[in-house]
């Protein structure tokens, strides 16, 4: 058995059933839950993020949920710092950190460390938003392709959050995101050669999703419709009424929120908002699958199977997590 303490990553696309399985695991294993979700960190954003209910969170606490205000930014570096601290606390209690969620960049940051990229710059971000409004996101994507074709190839023109971040990194630091990542890869290789690990845990990697992709698409559509019935629009109305939030913030750019915000701005009808929200969520799931396909040592579970708990426990036993 490894001398490093154990941890479990439970990954998967949105609407795949990660939370349900995580809770089942905590009932039979000495696990404590850590959320790995870039939207669940925000307070007062409950319906559109499909946040577990307050009653469920009271019974099965998740760390890193409801930790910042929607006006604030929360980076992958922030997550790594907070997650490592939470994992250390859980391990010190003799329990296993069980990290559950679908923000794959957070998992990657935790597992491999982060390149030394510049912090967010409000002025540069505002300039990019103005350019996008004037020229369109495709024009900004063309800019990125000219300076950083590698990043441009993996970032879609309709992904404004990642596109603006890539351009922001270049404008602030004078180096592209690809250049920063190449530096980080070299540092990681050096660490590996010296026997150092970026993450001081023995990690078991689980992923859950329906084997039939159409089932996931149907779940996404159904869940978005239920969110609207639960008062998603009213939730965004309340956020707008604060007066300090705007579509340039990461919180409001979250899938679903930006479509409802545009609807309230009169840019989309109710039907268009619902359709685009569902499409954006499906696109998110597609990106999550892309990340997951590149993840090594990943054990897949089918959401539609009735015995995923026993399958997960069997796998965890084979990788010595339960030894």
UniProtKB/Swiss-Prot annotation:
Tell me which cofactor or cofactors this protein depends on.
Mg(2+)
Q: Which Pfam families match?
A: IPPT
Which family does the entry's similarity section mention?
Belongs to the IPP transferase family.
- Cite the binding residues for substrate: 14-19
The record's InterPro entries line, in alphabetical order, gives: Dimethylallyltransferase, IPT, P-loop_NTPase
What name does the UniProt record give this protein?
tRNA dimethylallyltransferase
The enzyme's first-digit EC class, named in words, is: transferase
